[in-house]
Each structure stands twice: as C-alpha cells, then as structure tokens.
Amino acid sequence: MNTWIQLTLSTVLAVVLLSFMVWFIRVRPRQPQLEAVWNSDCELITTADIDDTKITFRNVRDFFWRTTKDRDESWIDEVTVDTEEIKDIWFIVDHFHSLHGLAHTYLTFEFNDGTCLSFSFEARRRVKHRYHPWDGLWRNYELYLLVALESDMTGLRTNARGNKDYMFRGITPPEKDKHMLIRMAQKANQLSEKPEWYHSLLTTCNTSIVRMVNRVTPGRVPFLWRNFLPGYTPRAALKLGLIEDWGGLETTLEKARIDLIAQQWNGEGSYSEMLRRHLPSSTVEKEQ
C-alpha cells in the first residue's frame, strides 16, 4: 500500500472517529425542547380535541404572505372538522431548490364545506436561525407539525417564494382517510407534550408522512430511496397507486402543477377554490 493511500485512509478514519466523538459528547446528550424563543411562523403548537367524528384543532396558522418578509400574521384559535366530511386528501410536492430531489412534501385535507387544512412536518427554528440540512443532522431543530390553512401553507410557496409546486389527489382505501386525519391529530398532541428531534435524513417532511401512512395501512409505502429525496416521489406514488393517474407521469405532472396558476390569481375569492378549478376532477370512485 503506497503512502498516499495510507494517508487517505488515516484521514478518513480520523474524521469518522472525530464525528463519533462529537456525536456522543456534544450532540447525543441534547434534549428536544418545548420552550424557546421560536420564529413567529412556528411559535405556536397545534393541539387537537377528538370527539367521535369531530376534531377541533387549536392554534391553526393563517398567515397572508405578500413576500417571505411582508406578511400578516394570524393564528386561529379553533378549527373544527368532521372526519365523515373529508372530500379529498392532496399530496403536495414543493420544489424549493435547483436540485430536483430536494423538495418539501405535505398533505392537505379538503372537506365538503370547503375547509382545506394542510399538515406539514417541519424543522422548528429559533429566532434568527435559518434552516440548513447539515444542521438538521446534529439535533439543532425540533420536529414541528404545522397545521395551517391551505391559503397560508401553499400560498407561501406558490406566491411568496415562487417555488415550482405540484398538487396530486391522493388515493386512500375506504375509511383510511379518516384514520389518517385522526393520526395527524394524535401526532400533534404527542409533539405538544413530548418533543422530538427533526433529522435531515431520518425524520423529515416526507419520511414522517411515510411513517404515518404505514401506521394507518402497514406496508403501504415500501422502503425506497425516493423517500429520502422527496422531489422524486411523484413517480413512486403514481406507481404505487397513492395518487391519481391523470394520463401517465408526464401528463399528471403537467396537470398537477399549480404555481403558475396561483401566481396569476388576482386575490379575489377563495385561494383553494381557485386552485381546484384548474385541477382534474377525481378519476377514482370512492367506496363507502
């Protein structure tokens, strides 16, 4: 073995050992917190009261975003929905980076009365802290389940940030949509009492959704590399029958794109209704 190879192996070994030391000495002892000076967009934690088919969510975000810095901040004290009135579950893929695989995913529950509630697993950030994937590997962010009106959560991405966004109608077996919403409510309550760490690979927006889906329907989403690169999830979701097929992958992507439509919106009427006017009607008949 020549000297250069020996030096390279020694350097790699030293870096690995140093990383383990930092993890066990500095990172592992850290405990997730509920109390801190949080950024205003993740300041409050949502909790839920479950009463038969009715679920009341408390502290639902309802910001109006003109830009990422210019916004009207508001939190709704209570939003009550009925699991029997779920119309659709939507899967949103938000491409926030030039690298296609780097994206944010979340779910929106649409109800028959027009209410659209979005659920997003995110990194909870302290004041003056910005998100970075590297920091997320080292227990720098708590896991945060943001519950917000669709006009807030999706409007932020399509209009204020100008990201490329896709919105797919989910396919759920009978009763599973109700169970999924209940799971979301239960998870919100769990995080309000016992905080958890966010992790840039293992506990992200998409892996958290996958985990929730598989708890409702065990084995529904297999272990896939795309789970860790959410930008590539539409292909897998279509193949697995998790989202509606609107004419093959490319056509489905074309029809599901919402950012260009949203950016032409004049602000009149309902943001959610505006989006759905441009999305295909359901191609799957729901079983009762």
PLM-predicted stretches and their roles:
Residues 148-188:
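A structural motif
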Residues 30-47:
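Alpha-helical transmembrane signal-anchor/signal-peptide segments
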